[in-house]
């Protein structure tokens, strides 16, 4: 009798543990490039998702900057140790699109998981970057931004300038830098992301090609073509300012943002997503303006996006893919997108998020935070302003940065 009771007890215990195992959460991995304030805000999103349901757990890991994260993802995929979700900056989009079999397309992932998904709910100027010519979205836009001009109003006053003065053209910016230099301002101008701001977006904003084949959207056999008179004029101007001490070069990426946040730089061209760090750290009054253009241009066209999208990598189980789909659906929710947009300065990538933000009064109480979206969508896109889709673009950018450094230090001409 005791033996029978022991067997029954053992079976009950086994059933209990089997039930616990069956109810264990499915864990997925997300590799990204965010540290600092953006990393904190990303962590908030993950924690909120994990707490919102009891089926899935997302574990996020920073793998370095954008380039390092992409390279880590590629290496891990080859070794069969890759994450479920990989953050890929816009420069890597063409390379991922060409790597068929390495990812599960967004539209297919959501369909297979039974998740409601409306690609038309995304802002077309953003989603077009990650969508095939026949309208199929391959990855989910996550953090999309565009460059703007940041203004340290306190230093403008110190330079004897009206902090609200017109800075819409590069000529007017040059006049402000002259005044700042004359007043002893050590860093009148600085910039982040040189190629992205001063060649890629510069081209789109002036409606001139950066590369042939509609900047890569119309074919693979693409050639770079940023050698127009206005391109040359702008790079020569930057070089001249650098030689005159009006423009201080701080690094190829967003290193100059640290100087601006510390109150050292008067005018800075940087991503709209600089907002998160500037709002948190700046001890001065700052403003946001549209990216300047050359007055010879009748009117600026539109800028293009930077930032990243999230790719669901292949080779994962059906249950893990369901977890990935659930998490991406969560991230695209209006409330999540609106908060991310307001906290970071990244664009609201869904039309509903932008509408909710406007309705909340956020733009009125935070002047300038709507300029990035206006600047990107001010005109119907052209072949020159739709964006860029070039293979090996990260390497191309590295070469461009090296050449621009030569112009800044006076060893090369535009």
What is the predicted function of each stretch?
Residues 89-148, 174, 200-204, 287-290, ...:
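Hinge/lid segment of periplasmic solute-binding proteins
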Residues 48-122, 158-165, 259, 264-267, ...:
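Extracytoplasmic "Venus flytrap"/periplasmic binding protein-like
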Residues 174-180, 217-250:
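Glycine-centered hinge/linker elements that transmit conformational signals in sensory
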């Amino acid at each position: 009798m005791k033996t029978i009771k022991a067997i029954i007890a053992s079976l009950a215990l086994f059933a209990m543990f089997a039930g616990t195992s069956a109810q264990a959460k499915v864990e997925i991995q997300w590799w990204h490039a965010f540290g600092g304030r953006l990393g904190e805000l990303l962590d908030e999103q993950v924690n909120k998702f994990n707490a919102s349901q009891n089926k899935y757990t997302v574990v996020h890991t920073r793998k370095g900057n954008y380039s390092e994260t992409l390279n880590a993802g590629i290496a891990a995929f080859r070794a069969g140790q890759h994450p479920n979700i990989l953050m890929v900056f816009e420069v890597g989009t063409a390379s991922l699109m060409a790597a068929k079999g390495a990812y599960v397309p967004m539209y297919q992932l959501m369909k297979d998981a039974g998740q409601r998904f409306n690609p038309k709910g995304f802002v077309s100027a953003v989603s077009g970057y990650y969508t095939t010519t026949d309208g199929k979205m391959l990855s989910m836009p996550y953090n999309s931004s565009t460059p703007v001009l940041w203004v340290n109003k306190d230093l403008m006053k110190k330079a004897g300038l009206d902090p609200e003065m017109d800075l819409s053209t590069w000529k007017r910016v040059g006049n402000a830098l002259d005044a700042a230099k004359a007043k002893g301002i050590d860093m009148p101008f600085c910039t982040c992301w040189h190629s992205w701001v001063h060649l890629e977006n510069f081209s789109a904003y002036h409606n001139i090609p950066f590369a042939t084949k509609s900047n890569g959207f119309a074919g693979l056999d693409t050639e770079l073509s940023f050698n127009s008179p206005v391109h040359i004029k702008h790079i020569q101007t930057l070089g001249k300012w650098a030689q005159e001490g009006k423009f201080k070069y701080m690094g190829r990426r967003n290193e100059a943002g640290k100087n601006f946040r510390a109150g050292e730089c008067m005018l800075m061209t940087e991503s709209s997503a600089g907002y998160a760090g500037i709002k948190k750290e700046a001890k001065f009054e700052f403003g946001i303006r549209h990216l300047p253009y050359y007055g010879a241009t009748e009117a600026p066209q539109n800028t293009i996006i930077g930032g990243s999208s999230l790719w669901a990598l292949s080779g994962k189980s059906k249950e893990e893919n369901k977890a990935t789909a659930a998490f991406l659906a969560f991230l695209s929710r209006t409330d999540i997108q609106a908060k991310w947009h307001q906290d970071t300065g990244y664009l609201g990538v869904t039309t509903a998020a932008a509408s909710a933000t406007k309705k909340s009064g956020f733009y009125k109480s935070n002047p300038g935070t709507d300029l990035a979206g206006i600047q990107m969508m001010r005109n119907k896109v052209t072949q020159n302003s739709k964006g860029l889709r070039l293979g090996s673009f990260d390497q191309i950018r590295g070469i461009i940065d090296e050449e621009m450094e030569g112009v800044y230090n006076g060893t090369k001409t535009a």
